Each structure stands twice: as C-alpha cells, then as structure tokens.
A protein has these predicted regions:
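C-terminal catalytic histidine-bearing segment of alpha/beta-hydrolase fold enzymes
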Residues: 146-194
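Short loop/turn segments at strand-loop or loop-helix junctions that form parts
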Residues: 1-7, 77-79, 114-121, 170-172
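The feature captures the conserved acid-bearing segment of alpha/beta-hydrolase catalytic domains
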Residues: 72-73, 79-157
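Short glycine-enriched nucleophile-adjacent loop
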Residues: 56-67, 184
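Serine-hydrolase catalytic machinery in alpha/beta-hydrolase-like enzymes
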Residues: 1-46
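Extracellular/periplasmic catalytic domains that process cell-envelope and extracellular macromolecules
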Residues: 42-43, 67-69, 104-109, 160-161
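Phosphate/oxyanion-binding active-site loops and adjacent basic polyanion-contact surfaces
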Residues: 18-29, 90, 140-145, 177-180
Length: 194
C-alpha cells in the first residue's frame, strides 16, 4: 500500500518526513517504463505523463525528486497542494529536502502543461488538504495552483533558469478528471504518430 504516494512516500500530508522509508517512489515510473519498454520492444527513450489531483501531486514531486530523466512532457492539474521552491519544510517546500541544481534545471525546463479549473475553488472540498502548510498556499485548488506556478516563474527568473511550463486556467471547470483529461490529451498527444 502506498498511503503517501502523493509525496513519493517521503512524508505524510501533514509534513512528517520519513527518513528511512522502504516505500519511496522516487524511481517508480522509471521502473515501469523500463519493464514495458523491454517487454514490448518499444524503441522510444522517453515517455509522457499525466496527473490529476493526487496524481498531479505525485507527478510534480516525482519530477522534482525522482532520478528519472526520461519524462519528455507532462500535464498536471488540480493538485490540492504543492512542494514550492521556497524555505518551507517538505512537503510544502524544499528547505529540509534540497534539490540538486541540475535536477531543478531539468525540472523547470521540461514541457509541462499546468492546468487549473477556474471553478475548482471550493475551500471545503472533501479531498482538499486542510493542514496549515497547505492552507498557506491558498484557500482552494485554483488559488494554490496559481501561487505555485508564480513561485516557479519567480524561482526560474531569479536563478536564471529556463522555464518551459505553460499555464492554462479553464473556464467552467471544477474538480473533474474527465474534463481535465480532455484539456490535457491534445498537449500530450501532440507530435505523436498513432
């Protein structure tokens, strides 16, 4: 069981870090990709990934703390909270779990579509993290997402790092995976022959 999959098994959603976790997921997708690449004789060296809500939390932290550099593109949306590039403790920030500069360069330079629903603004949503660290990021998912995206822009500018993420706020969209997928799919499928 991966109760804390959204933090890669590195911390609880309240911020308690796990130093010796045997269930760290920092290389999990890479292992699956390697297996399927071998089993089906896939010729590609990269893959594209999508995460919604808790999956979005997983994907952005996987890209931050993972060892895998085979993610070509990602689309993430509607996370309830994020790991900011700031001095907050993990999983809300990186102060006690720093990231190597080369990894940050890689993370910020990936092609990522960051999608928020304009109507994903319920501060009392049943699955929204209501811990103090998450509430500091904003009242609801849309606010927290805007804050996170702006944090990444500012970090990249201050540190003169490339930033290739795209922001999309979708009118009328609430916390809905089907509609989020419709917005992510054209981006993730662009340029593929299928």
């Amino acid at each position: 069981s991966f109760l804390y999959y959204n933090t890669l098994g590195l911390a609880s959603s309240s911020g308690k870090t796990f130093k010796n976790s045997k269930t760290k997921l920092t290389n999990s997708i890479s292992s699956f990709f390697t297996f399927f690449k071998s089993k089906y004789d896939l010729k590609t060296e990269t893959y594209r990934i999508f995460g919604f809500s808790g999956g979005s939390q997983f994907v952005h932290r996987y890209m931050m703390y993972g060892k895998d550099e085979r993610v070509e593109m990602a689309a993430i949306g509607s996370a309830g909270w994020y790991t900011f590039l700031n001095n907050e403790p993990f999983p809300f920030g990186i102060t006690n779990m720093p990231i190597d500069k080369n990894r940050l360069d890689w993370f910020l330079s990936r092609e990522v579509l960051f999608i928020l629903g304009k109507n994903d603004n319920d501060p009392n949503h049943s699955s929204l993290n209501s811990n103090y660290g998450a509430k500091k990021q904003g009242a609801h998912r849309h606010q927290r997402g805007e804050s996170y995206f702006n944090n990444l822009i500012n970090y990249a500018e201050i540190n003169e790092m490339p930033f290739r993420w795209r922001f999309r706020s979708v009118e009328g969209l609430d916390h809905n995976i089907e509609e989020m997928t419709k917005n992510a799919a054209p981006f993730l499928l662009s340029g593929l022959e299928y």
